[in-house]
Swiss-Prot record:
Belongs to the adenylate kinase family. GO terms for cellular component: cytoplasm. The keyword Kinase applies. Residues 30-59 are annotated as: NMP. This is Adenylate kinase. Monomer. Consists of three domains, a large central CORE domain and two small peripheral domains, NMPbind and LID, which undergo movements during catalysis. The LID domain closes over the site of phosphoryl transfer upon ATP binding. Assembling and dissambling the active center during each catalytic cycle provides an effective means to prevent ATP hydrolysis.
Length: 186
């Protein structure tokens, strides 16, 4: 199974991606996790990414596309994967389409998690307090939500037109949300 998991920051994409990966026995590819690992370890990639994320900006497509393409080509992705945090804009949709065509691996489903803005803000404030993520300042949170609404949310229409979109309420018990997603996919 090849899935995209989409939704605004704080909706629970990472949590649900991990549970779905375990359920379907496929890897999760989180561009955010890849970037955070590299930022934490101050790699060349991390320092480049940090120059954007510290200002609440998205990492440029050229960098993100390269990371995703390299990761999708790995052996553990042969039987499927879950992409979390990608694509985020129309240019990345086109890039992903090209990658999947090259790999001869069509996308199966796009899961869109939804939650009200006040729920998202509360979750991100809590995450910032618990995890101390540098990119969870109030200003960065507001900017990322605004960017999602402007650039990423419209992508759901593309996937809906392709018949791939599954919209799921991202509010409630974690296992309950997973159950909703799995019932749509199986």
């Amino acid at each position: 199974m090849r899935l995209l998991i989409m939704g605004p920051q704080g909706v629970g994409k990472g949590t649900q991606a991990a549970l779905l990966a375990e359920h379907f026995n496929i890897p999760t590819i989180s561009t955010g996790d890849i970037f955070r690992y590299n930022i934490k370890n101050k790699t060349e990639l991390g320092l480049e990414a940090m120059s954007y994320t510290d200002k609440g900006e998205l990492v440029p497509d050229s960098l993100t596309n390269k990371i995703v393409k390299d990761r999708l080509a790995k052996e553990d992705c042969k039987n499927g994967w879950i992409l979390d945090g990608y694509p985020r804009n129309a240019a990345q949709v086109t890039a992903l389409d090209e990658m999947l065509a090259d790999l001869d691996t069509p996308l199966d489903h796009v899961v869109a998690l939804e939650a009200a803005r006040d729920v998202l803000l509360e979750r991100m404030k809590k995450r910032a307090a618990e995890q101390g993520r540098a990119d969870d300042t109030p200003e960065a949170i507001a900017k990322r939500l605004e960017t999602y609404e402007k650039e990423t949310a419209p992508l759901l229409d593309i996937y809906e037109a392709r018949g791939l979109l599954v919209v799921v309420n991202g509010v409630g018990d974690i296992d309950e949300i997973s159950g909703r997603i799995i019932s749509h996919l199986e």
